[in-house]
Amino acid sequence: MHRRLPWLLSCALAACVPAFGLVVAYSPTAGASTAPAHSRPEARALAIARQALRHLDVGQHATDHRVSGSATRVKGLTQVSSTNWAGYADDNTKGNTYSKVTGKWSEPSASCTSATSLAAFWVGIDGYTSASVEQDGTLAECYLGTAYYFSWWEMYPSNAIQVVGESVAPGDRITASVVKSGSRYTLKITDATHSANSFTTTQTCSSCVDTSAEWIAEAPSGSSGVEPLSNFHTWKESSATVKSGSAKGVISTFPDDEITMINSSGATKAKTGSLNSSGNGFTVTWERSS
């Protein structure tokens, strides 16, 4: 079943950049650590790369169809493929709704070419079978051969991606969570390595349906389709938890889908591995950019 591709970039990033000026400086919270000082050219490049993200959304699952082959390793597991997602989603095939999702990872290191590419890593509620996503995570952007890393949140489609931290670095220890209470969603990122990238924000959504929980590596999409996926090598999600009603568990506690990212020809772009023995972790491996 095909779904609408999200409008994630109003134009190709490289084409947008000449129209952008320098971004307004980000002020970390009191007591937060800051990244090392950049030279003026490096600071300008970082500002342009960040400014290009103003038009970026990290949106909903673009396609949903079964991958050939059985999925017998984990009870309740379904294998599907997507043109923009890789990872796991807990769904609502048994009527579940979700109120909390958490995940942990070490920020992957992106290998860049001269081409612009993107890779987003996040946890969230909704988006797998619904039109909204309440999410937060990190993002690797390859721009002119250099990798830039950010922390962000988004209440799709209400707002574009909200970049908070611009000093995320490969190896940073990231914890992400989304918690619902009533119509309020608290989105929190903790960067235990560089605290300037940490944040907590509470947003309101009265129409969100909470019918899925996700742990995802994503290739964002623009007006021309799915953008090239940055070579992040591997992304290892660990210590994932989820809550549905009064039940607390891990990914495998609820009906879960293993999602592999493919291109329009069916070739694998990012391969999702099996859940670990605890049912709370997995690895996504990059295979191609497009």
Residue map of PLM features:
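Exposed, interaction-prone regions of secreted/extracellular proteins
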Residues: 25-26, 30-290
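Secretory targeting and sorting signals
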Residues: 2-32
